[in-house]
Amino acid sequence: LDKAWAKIEKPAPNTGSRELMGFILEAAGSSAHQQRASQIEGAFQSLEKMQDRDPHSKTFGNFCWYWHEQKPGDLNAVEFVTQQGALLKLRFADNLSPKALESLDRILTLAVEGIHRQKVNVDYTNIFLMKVWNLLALGEILKKPELAQEGASMQDQWIDFTSKNGITEYLSPTYYGVDLDSLALMAKDLSNPPVQDKAQRILRLFWNNVAANWFEPGGRLGGAHGRDYDYLTGHDALDRHLKDAGWIISKETKPQEVPTFDDATKWIPPDEIHQKALGGIPRFVFQKCGVTENNWASQYIGRHFSIGVAGTSNGPEDKPFALNLAGPAGPQTVMFNFFMDSRGDPYGNKKVPTGASGHMKSHHLVPLLRAVQSGSEVLLLASWPPEARPNFKKETQPVCLLSHLDIPFEAVAWTADKPLDVTQQPMSLPENTCFFRMGDVAIGVRFLLSLDTAGQPVSAQLVNDGTAWKAKRLTVTHSLGAPGEGRGIVAFAIRVQEGLDDSGFAAFRRSFLSSKTSAVNEGNVVRLSTDGLKGKLSLDVDLATGQILRSEGGDHSLQIAPMSVNGSEYSKGLLDGQSAVGF
């Protein structure tokens, strides 16, 4: 707290309103709250300066995210500040001085206006659920039952939407943590049994979804991810909840930074859910993650690998294809991760200002992406620009066009008959095909199509950038400079098998190389096919419209919406209040 106060006593340009309310909550929740009364009052004074008090403003009641802003930019600020402010009022109002309590009451009363003026769609999972908590809590705090009823109606709306369409910010290592925060607050800190019961149902749904997609050797979610800022290892805010639940063991010994908030948002799932996560291997997992037919994600989970893909790429933080391997670094083992890049940022470590408030993030392109999965095989097509060309008003203008497949550095690269000597010089792949091996797991990758923006074939290259990121990559260069009006296209087939010794790995390479493939690019239509272990995988797509003209070979009997494991749907019963563990 002393360090936190030193940072905010005299706010710097990047001091955040969420940061200020967070300090107040932690100070008020500490045993030394009386000694910190003047600090709490000072933080409130700064926070009130960041709230829009102009009744004629469109953002009346909202907050500047950063101290340097003249007016609110990221309108989610009111949700994050209120999330903590409402908890403060419900749990620690008696620990505040009269002056501080008056500040809090002014802030929360005005925040109602800011919350109402911010329109949040039901598919914006983390902010929608946070808004539900805020309205429910404010209804109780301000003794306005109409606010609580509004929050309860939104909770019902989310349940109804999700029972049909799944979780839209699916398997997000960042936002699942935020979701669990808001849901735990609903379950623990309200005086509304029906709403609290539904919050518990949703918590069980999230934890079952985590369990279904759990990759134990990596201590993380496997599969494709919606909104994942950690390109290489897929960890973030969810990890705290996983540690609390005993699913992962933390080696950190430093004290918690926000123990009051962490304690308030802790909800431990039943152990049988964890046991489900650890058992049932191999399994095939499927889920809807939006309203369109392409909003889905599937994953095959083995003992030492998991491979998953999504039906589309929704945003610049999505991870639409991911292959996890059991590696010597455990949770820090780099995953295979595909994305298209316009900034020369192959490992997601170059952050730039994004959005209305200029949050520093590493964004990739949002291509037209379509895929089909059968067991441990995936056929994927990506094209940029997508069917609706972006305007880049809030994103960095493209300076290049590249497709990357990040790979753990420890995975040994092979040609058809020998290991590759991976130097720091880019190496073109023979026949656009290569193999990787880690432990008893073998991976075959074949680029069926790799075209530059002039429509000419280019070779995929294996690139070693050194050990700084514990990763290497396969890269297709569609354009070294700004891509202009041209279109870059990439398509690859990938197969994974485990339990292989040296002779098994040799047989794997022979089998993969002998698989017949075809790739035809006719105008706006791309037609792809590859022989798979169970049969042919085919994918025909109109790049001008994004329409799938043909998709064959997927495990359709196992792809049961909205959420299923091995073809058995598990989400609806949980949301209906059944006591079943889930899958």
Question: Which residue ranges define each predicted feature?
Answer:
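Extracellular polysaccharide-recognition and catalytic grooves
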Residues: 76, 80-90, 99-283
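Ser/Thr/Asn(+Pro)-rich, low-complexity disordered segments
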Residues: 1-93, 99-116, 255-583
